[in-house]
Swiss-Prot record:
UniProt record, GO biological process: cell division; regulation of division septum assembly
A Pfam family recorded for this sequence: MinE
Species for this entry: Synechococcus sp. (strain CC9311)
Keyword Cell division: yes
Protein's name according to its UniProt entry: Cell division topological specificity factor
Function text: Prevents the cell division inhibition by proteins MinC and MinD at internal division sites while permitting inhibition at polar sites. This ensures cell division at the proper site by restricting the formation of a division septum at the midpoint of the long axis of the cell.
Keyword Cell division (UniProt): yes
Membership in a protein family: Belongs to the MinE family.
Transmembrane segments: none
SUPFAM superfamilies hit by this protein: Cell division protein MinE topological specificity domain
NCBIfam families xref list: minE (TIGR01215), PRK00296.1 (NF001422)
InterPro entries in the record: MinE, MinE_sf
Keywords: Cell cycle, Cell division
């Protein structure tokens, strides 16, 4: 999410159709370049949410994990709004 997207969201502005189309095309290209199946990407999202939720209280409804491409580089981007930190220590793994 760019700064402009954040400002537009805060002000309640709707994105222009050209901007929306460009964002969708970038998403399709990112998915294509990553060679990840939709099922694998969904599994990754669930697991990322589970791991982060061990340390902080996150808003799962507002959270998002996506692939973004910029300058021919594809990145996995997690946008997970925190509600509050979890004060107890995370469970130890075996």
């Amino acid at each position: 999410m760019t700064l402009r997207d954040l400002v537009d969201k805060l002000l309640g502005r709707q994105p222009a159709s050209a901007s929306t189309a460009r964002d969708r095309l970038q998403l399709v290209l990112a998915h294509d370049r990553s060679d990840l199946s939709p099922e694998l990407l969904d599994q990754m999202r669930r697991e990322i949410f589970e791991v982060v939720a061990k340390y902080v209280d996150i808003d799962l409804e507002e959270g998002d994990v996506s692939l973004e491409t910029e300058d021919r580089v594809t990145a996995l981007v997690a946008n997970l709004p925190f509600r509050r930190p979890i004060t107890s220590a995370p469970p130890k793994s075996d």
